[in-house]
Amino acid sequence: MSQTYNVTLLPGDGIGPEIMAVAVAVLGKVADQFGFAFNFQEALIGGAAIDATGQPLPEATLAQAKDSDAVLLAAIGGYAWDNLPRSQRPETGLLAIREGLGLFANLRPATIFPQLIDASSLKREVVEGVDIMVVRELTGGIYFGKPKGIFETETGEKRGVNTMAYTVGEIDRIAKVAFETARKRRGQLCSVDKANVLDVSQLWRDRVMAIAVDYPDVELSHLYVDNAAMQLVRSPRQFDTIVTGNLFGDILSDIAAMLTGSIGMLPSASLGSDGPGLFEPVHGSAPDIAGQDKANPLAQVLSAAMMLRYGLDQPQAADRLEDAVKKVLEQGYRTGDILSPGTQLVGCRQMGEQLLSILDEM
């Protein structure tokens, strides 16, 4: 009897419904090819949820997501909700669903597609063959540590305080995700910290080394964050999988992303210890082109591939989707954001049709 996966779809706002439609179509195709099935159920989040219910994350959406095998999100936000109080904006729905699902590990790949290599701001010989996965701790560190705030000292001077703190449990669980991720890739993990000056980073390094004992097949190295940032630009091919804390990961994942030259091609995943993961493209909702069939659906398709690989344990189906994306680029099809001389401009729907045609031939 074939496996059926329950997947919550969160099309969200802007171009979200358009790119989600492409992802659903290609997922259905690879499911047929590999002998499993999907039960897709849509739910509201972000601006669409605010308009319908007054809340960026309705309770019904979170409940449905918790009962799913995986959650696939498209895009959140737009100009229409920019004047709302910060706590009521669409983006708070994303933070709330991450918290509600207990997601603490953010996986951000940065892969150079040979057909798009000239979009990178770095020289071809530097970025050719780059394939990096940044595993960022998502719920701890300086963004969440306490005490925090702006206080007045005894002399009347204002003082801003944030606290970078990690527990052993928080470090151990992100380290395990990173080692498991590296094991599924090329077996190399670089832990990034600032252990030469920060006590919290010394604990980080100690715990990562302790967890490494359980992963003898993964080669572990360490870099200080300033050197890691430099090496990402100087010699990015040396990296396979990187694991780091929330603040450092926030910065390094964006550096790694821009090696590729096109944010419209970048997927991501957020995972927890158990329960469903959340899979979404890195790009925004692009309200300026929404409903015009101009959106690039490839990051959404690659997010669906990450869902297959890291959320549903269907690595062969994930490979198939990723290969289809490479093939469609090889054939010269481009949406406007990645268009270059000698390539063919297509819309979102046609890009999806080309992917389906390629999958039929694979």
UniProtKB/Swiss-Prot annotation:
It is found in: Cytoplasm. Homodimer. PANTHER family: 3-ISOPROPYLMALATE DEHYDROGENASE. It catalyses: (2R,3S)-3-isopropylmalate + NAD(+) = 4-methyl-2-oxopentanoate + CO2 + NADH. Keywords: Amino-acid biosynthesis, Branched-chain amino acid biosynthesis, Cytoplasm, Leucine biosynthesis, Magnesium, Manganese, Metal-binding, NAD, Oxidoreductase. One of its GO terms (molecular function) is magnesium ion binding. This is 3-isopropylmalate dehydrogenase. GO terms for biological process: L-leucine biosynthetic process. Its cofactor is Mg(2+); Mn(2+). It comes from the Bacteria. HAMAP family: LeuB_type1 (MF_01033). Its main location: cytoplasm. The record marks Y143, K194 as: Important for catalysis. It comes from Synechocystis sp. (strain ATCC 27184 / PCC 6803 / Kazusa). The keyword Ubl conjugation does not apply. NAD(+) binds at residues 78-91, 284-296. Substrate binds at R98, R108, R136, D226. Catalyzes the oxidation of 3-carboxy-2-hydroxy-4-methylpentanoate (3-isopropylmalate) to 3-carboxy-4-methyl-2-oxopentanoate. The product decarboxylates to 4-methyl-2 oxopentanoate. Belongs to the isocitrate and isopropylmalate dehydrogenases family. LeuB type 1 subfamily. Binds 1 Mg(2+) or Mn(2+) ion per subunit. Coiled coil: none annotated. Its EC number is 1.1.1.85. Pathway: Amino-acid biosynthesis; L-leucine biosynthesis; L-leucine from 3-methyl-2-oxobutanoate: step 3/4.
